[in-house]
Amino acid sequence: MVTIVLGSQWGDEGKGKITDYLSQDATLCCRSAGGHNAGHTIVHDSVTYDFHILPSGLVSPKCINLIGAGTVVHIPSFFKELSALADKGLVDVDSRVFISDRAHVCFDLHSVVDGLEEAKLGGRKVGTTGKGIGPCYSDKASRRGVRVGEILDEEVFERKLRNLESGYRSRFGELAYDVEDEINRFKEYRQKLKPYIVDQLSFLQKYKNDDRILVEGANALMLDLDHGTYPFVTSSSTGLGGAIQGLSLNPTKIKNIIGVVKAYTTRVGSGPFPTEQLNEFGEKLQVAGREFGVTTGRKRRCGWFDLVLCRYSLAVNHYTALNLTKLDILDDFDEIKVAVAYTLPDGTRLEDSYPADPNLIEKLEVEYITLPGWKTNTMGLTKYEDLPENAQKYVEYIERGLDGVPIKWIGTGPAREHLIIR
């Protein structure tokens, strides 16, 4: 049995927490796409762990972890993150994580190019994390990228990296980058990395009859290269299709597709955001929710819950259950708004589809309903019946608005135990 956890909005929904909870019973936890641009925090036994490229199943001592073929891996960050987890007391992290030999290598070169490309876009920049993810995926699509398995072949690796550097230097001129310096650093990584590299397909065959495989999505559906608010998206497939493709999953083995939705909406970086609140409500959400990016430290843009967006996300990803997170952040609001429809400039009303044109999204009007707040502390609650009546009504309104897909888990705080299971 395969369970897939996916972000339903623009990321930062709290996927790591439910993944951490579910990984307690998982044999294998996998990352299918993305790189160290992703970021989430897990609080376990009062210890805070920050994850970027590593699967958060590492917090569970019996869980094996795989970084799949659809990912891009910055090797220095991989080792730095492993070391940080070990320093915080996680056991056997070195022996419980593996990387597909088909994953692509994200170089420091890609980070340099990322910054140059963003600078050229000026006022229409995407707002990337600056980690080089886009240029790395671009090299992959152009068939000039370097795969993790190729690191082990010194001659091939060095030739391909020099060719990459030469191509970018022809395009941009002088680069603040020394290719020989990066090549020399990989001389140190080569043997160190070897035990982690596996043939993904044969590796997964060992688990084909196991009913406890957990897939941890990165980013979220609205950042998907095909289905998100293009071009203000990441460079990988962040939805259900990307999970299947990046890990060569058997679709018939998928039992659960869990959509993680924050009780309000946030976004990092540029791009349209219909329910964004550039006022005291947005600021209050930002402060109460501690909305700062784990990867970049940037303030997240904040706004009301968007049913239109989440209906679209549901239609693409086919969620079988939902995890509503950070409900407690709304505790101090007198009233809470939910977006239920958009009106386009020509008068067309949309309830369950999302415009492809970002310029059109910027011009639409949002229709809200207003629900009463509950003005009661819900942090740390673990029983649904203990929620204030208005908090229950809020949960059930969202559930009805999303075709009755059950909200099985409700987050009421940052720790693993701050969770209501319905």
Curated annotation (Swiss-Prot):
SMART domains: Adenylsucc_synt
Cofactor: Mg(2+)
Gene Ontology molecular-function annotations: adenylosuccinate synthase activity; AMP binding; GMP binding; GTP binding; magnesium ion binding
Binding residues annotated for substrate, in chain numbering: 294-300
Pathway stated in the Swiss-Prot or TrEMBL entry: Purine metabolism; AMP biosynthesis via de novo pathway; AMP from IMP: step 1/2
UniProt EC number: 6.3.4.4
Family that this chain belongs to: Belongs to the adenylosuccinate synthetase family.
Name of the protein described by the UniProt record: Adenylosuccinate synthetase
